[in-house]
């Protein structure tokens, strides 16, 4: 009997140390009713299974998976905030875009530890129903576990972890995958420890009623009424020692796992503390500095002003280059017009010279035609006499036909001829006198004679011109007087003789006017020559009549030639004049085009000036606008400065909150260290329990030799059991305190994370 009792005590100590395994039954057999008033096989407050047919059931610790919502990470999105301007009633509202982080969730799985009633190992048949042989089955007629009275839980009672839900921070649906994993592990560890200790919080669980199984304990206790009669005679079933050792090994492994979890918690706490330290030591944001904001605004204004000036200078340079190009084009056109006018003047000068040459050639031709009658003065005199005869005849005819008008015409002819001859001969004779006065000697006399001959020739040409003019006037007069006038006869010849007499007198006076140095021989020769000239003149007078007809023919030919020349000259002149008119028209048109282009350029310049004025006004308006914006920016900067000050106050508050969080984390770290010390102390207590088991084993060997009556009087064993219960109560209090610290840590972490997201 003593040996069996020692084995059961070791089993109870191992089970109280927190042994659990998936699907592993925790066996216990009831003791005899006469053993002691301190029965270890008592039921809970309300049994989960009614006593009766379920005597072969055992409590199993099972694990099941449940779905839950986990936070996978965070994603960012842009949120627009509209804020009213605070420095004025009419200022526009500002829009600020913020990047906000929101959590992203996923469906995860969580393992939950629970108790299930199943058939004990090795039991089958009528006492083990089929629906309880399945490992996933749960016993029927399960009822919820009632709340244990606070008076029976010892000094530090705590409710079951499954009936209390951890508080969650506001505004947050999850704590991230890392926090979820930590929470899951801590919850599992805390649930396991609480499940193991919950049944030992009240000593009445051990010494209470023995009619129902103890449900909250991590193992099943079958009451006395459920033991079969055949098993009661054979005594309680004793589990093998290897199973007990395996349970102890599992307990030690579980404790090592809890130590590792505590180490992880400590590492997480230290990591959070380091992160908070980095947040405290992080430099402030550059946007909170007013000097940096002012420098940024100044740089933006300088860049804007530089860009405006550069654009204005580029526009001015473009306008100036365009104006220069247009001025160069106008200058080029003016130079081309000047060159064209110069070419026109040169062509006109060339035409004028050509016309002058042609006129001089025409004069020489006319002079040649007048001299075709003879090469000497005699021939010229013959022609003159012939023309004079014809004139006399014409005048005679006029006098005969008209009578009175004839005398007038004769008087007119005499007057004209006398005046013409007088003027022309006087001039020529004066020229001859001057020439003769410059010569000396015989050579001089000869030269004077030659010059006199030249003078006579010139006199003949002059006389011919005078006669031609006289003929023209006579023809005009004859046409006016009578269109049917006849040719005059020789009645007008005395006039010619008188003129010749006058000429002879002038020659005589010329002879007498010679210098005294001349010799008489020369004078005699000259007199003889004059006489010869007189005789020749008489012969010429006779020849005049013969050459009258020839002279008339010659006059007709000359008239025809003159008409042809006049027509040719007129046509050429008309063509040249037409060409000149065309050139002048083209020049006038080009000048008109130049004036139009100049007017266009002037209009363009005026438009450019107006556009520049408008541009200047616009630039001034923009500058005023920029100044107003700068002033408004200054007011906004003041408002921003106030906001910065407010933000600084909020940051100070946040720093104070972070300091509080740091203090909380330090408390959490201290709690973790205390928990570690508690776990170490718990290991020591487990070692003490193992030693106690050994001592109890030795005690059991000694008790086997003692009778049963003496064993009843030994109260020391139950004293040890009371100590064990007291130790379990202390452990429950420590675990409750650790749970409170864990909840505080969770709340502080939940407060820190929203601040980081903001």
Swiss-Prot record:
Q: Name one GO molecular function term.
A: identical protein binding
Q: List the disulfide bonds.
A: 58-120, 85-91, 119-128
Q: Does the keyword Oxidoreductase apply?
A: no
Q: Which residues are glycosylated?
A: 65, 436, 555, 609, 725
- InterPro entries in alphabetical order: Collagen/C1q_domain, EMI_domain
Compartments, record wording: Secreted, Extracellular space, Extracellular matrix; Cytoplasm
Q: Which residues form the EMI domain?
A: 54-130
| Coiled-coil regions listed in the entry | 379-401, 460-483, 528-567, 642-677, 720-753
Give Gene Ontology CC terms. Answer: cytoplasm; extracellular region
* UniProt cross-references to SUPFAM superfamilies, sorted A to Z: Tropomyosin (SSF57997)
Q: Which residues form the signal peptide?
A: 1-21
Region described as Disordered: 131-178
List keywords of the entry alphabetically. Answer: Coiled coil, Cytoplasm, Disulfide bond, Extracellular matrix, Glycoprotein, Secreted, Signal
Main location (coarse class): secreted
Which PROSITE patterns does its entry note? EMI (PS51041)
- Record Pfam families: EMI
Under which name does UniProt file this protein?
EMILIN-3
């Amino acid at each position: 009997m003593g040996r069996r009792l020692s084995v059961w005590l070791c089993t109870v100590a191992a089970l109280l140390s927190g042994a659990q395994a998936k699907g592993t039954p925790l066996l216990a057999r009831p003791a005899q009713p006469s053993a002691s008033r301190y029965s270890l096989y008592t039921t809970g407050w309300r049994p989960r299974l009614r006593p009766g047919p379920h005597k072969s059931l055992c409590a199993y610790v099972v694990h099941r998976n449940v779905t839950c919502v986990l936070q996978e990470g965070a994603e960012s999105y842009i949120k627009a905030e509209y804020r009213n301007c605070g420095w004025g009633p009419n200022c526009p509202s500002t829009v600020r875009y913020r990047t906000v982080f929101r959590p992203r969730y996923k469906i995860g799985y969580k393992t939950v530890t629970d108790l299930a009633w199943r058939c004990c190992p090795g039991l089958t048949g009528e006492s083990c129903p089929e629906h309880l042989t399945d490992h996933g089955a749960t016993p029927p007629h399960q009822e919820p576990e009632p709340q244990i009275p606070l008076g029976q839980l010892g000094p530090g009672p705590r409710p079951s972890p499954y009936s209390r839900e951890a508080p969650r921070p506001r505004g947050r649906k999850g704590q991230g995958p890392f926090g979820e994993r930590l929470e899951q592990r801590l919850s599992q560890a805390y649930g396991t420890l609480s499940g193991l200790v919950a049944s030992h919080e009240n000593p009445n669980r051990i010494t209470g009623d023995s009619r129902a199984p103890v449900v909250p304990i991590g193992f099943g206790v079958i009451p006395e009424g459920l033991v079969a009669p055949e098993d009661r005679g054979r005594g309680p079933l004793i589990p093998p020692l290897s199973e007990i050792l395996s349970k102890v090994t599992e307990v030690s492994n579980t404790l090592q796992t809890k130590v590792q979890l505590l180490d992880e918690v400590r590492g997480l706490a230290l990591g959070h503390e380091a992160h908070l330290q980095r947040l405290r030591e992080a430099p402030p944001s550059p946007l909170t500095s007013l000097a940096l904001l002012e420098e940024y605004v100044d740089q933006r204004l300088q860049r804007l002003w530089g860009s405006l000036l550069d654009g204005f200078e580029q526009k001015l340079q473009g306008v100036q280059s365009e104006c220069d190009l247009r001025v160069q084009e106008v200058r080029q056109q003016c130079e081309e017009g000047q060159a064209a006018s110069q070419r026109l003047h040169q062509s006109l000068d060339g035409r004028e010279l050509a016309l002058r040459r042609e006129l001089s050639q025409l004069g020489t031709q006319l002079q040649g035609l007048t001299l075709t009658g003879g090469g000497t003065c005699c021939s010229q005199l013959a022609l003159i006499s012939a023309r004079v005869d014809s004139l006399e005849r014409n005048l005679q005819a006029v006098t005969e036909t008209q009578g009175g008008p004839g005398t007038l015409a004769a008087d007119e002819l005499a007057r004209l001829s006398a005046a013409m001859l007088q003027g022309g001969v006087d001039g020529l004779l004066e020229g001859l006198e001057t020439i003769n006065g410059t010569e000396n000697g015989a050579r001089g006399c000869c030269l004077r004679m030659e010059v006199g001959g030249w003078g006579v020739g010139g006199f003949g040409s002059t006389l011919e011109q005078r006669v031609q003019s006289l003929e023209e006037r006579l023809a005009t007069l004859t046409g006016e007087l009578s269109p049917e006038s006849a040719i005059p006869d020789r009645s007008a010849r005395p006039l010619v003789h008188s003129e010749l007499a006058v000429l002879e007198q002038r020659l005589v006076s010329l002879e007498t006017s010679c210098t005294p140095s001349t010799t008489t021989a020369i004078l005699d020769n000259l007199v003889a020559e004059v006489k010869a000239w007189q005789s020749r003149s008489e012969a010429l007078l006779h020849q005049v009549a013969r050459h009258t007809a020839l002279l008339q023919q010659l006059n007709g030919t000359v008239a025809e030639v003159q008409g042809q020349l006049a027509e040719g000259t007129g046509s050429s002149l008309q063509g040249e004049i037409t060409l000149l008119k065309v050139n002048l028209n083209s020049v006038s048109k080009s000048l008109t085009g130049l004036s139009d282009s100049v007017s266009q350029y002037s209009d363009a310049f005026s438009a450019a000036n107006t556009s520049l004025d408008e541009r200047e006004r616009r630039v001034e308006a923009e500058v005023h606008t920029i100044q107003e914006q700068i002033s408004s920016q200054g007011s906004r900067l003041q408002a921003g400065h106030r906001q910065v000050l407010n933000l600084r106050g909020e940051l100070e508050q946040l720093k104070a909150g972070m300091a509080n969080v740091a203090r909380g984390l330090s408390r959490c770290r201290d709690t973790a260290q205390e928990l570690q010390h508690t776990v170490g102390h718990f290991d020591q207590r487990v070692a003490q329990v193992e030693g106690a088991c050994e001592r109890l084993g030795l005690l059991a060997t000694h008790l086997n030799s003692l009778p049963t009556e003496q064993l009843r009087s030994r109260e020391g064993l139950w004293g040890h059991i009371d100590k064990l219960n007291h130790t379990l109560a202390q452990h429950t209090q420590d675990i409750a305190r650790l749970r409170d610290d864990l909840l505080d840590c969770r709340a502080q972490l939940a407060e820190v994370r929203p601040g980081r997201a903001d």
